Amino acid sequence: MSGSTGERPFSDIVTSIRYWVIHSVTIPSLFIAGWLFVSTGLAYDVFGTPRPNEYFTEERQELPLISDRYGALAQLDDLVPN
């Protein structure tokens, strides 16, 4: 039989009141924080992705595809507004 590591068994942790008091606050707050992060548009700003209404501008309505492997930088300069 192996020795004890001194850690509490998982079943004791899950059935304790302290576990559920802590997690009944932290789990919903993480969900709400994630929902606010996405719904306010902050996720678009942090990760630099365009918002759904910014994929196609008034000047450019075609798909922004790179078709030439060796001229990709020039095509990218044409597609990205400065």
Curated annotation (Swiss-Prot):
Location(s) in or outside the cell: Plastid, Chloroplast thylakoid membrane
Pfam families assigned to the protein according to its UniProt record, in alphabetical order: Cytochrom_B559, Cytochrom_B559a
GO BP term (any one): photosynthetic electron transport chain
Membrane topology: Single-pass membrane protein
Regions that span the bilayer: 21-35
Cofactor(s) demanded: heme b
Stated role: This b-type cytochrome is tightly associated with the reaction center of photosystem II (PSII). PSII is a light-driven water:plastoquinone oxidoreductase that uses light energy to abstract electrons from H(2)O, generating O(2) and a proton gradient subsequently used for ATP formation. It consists of a core antenna complex that captures photons, and an electron transfer chain that converts photonic excitation into a charge separation.
Protein known as: Cytochrome b559 subunit alpha
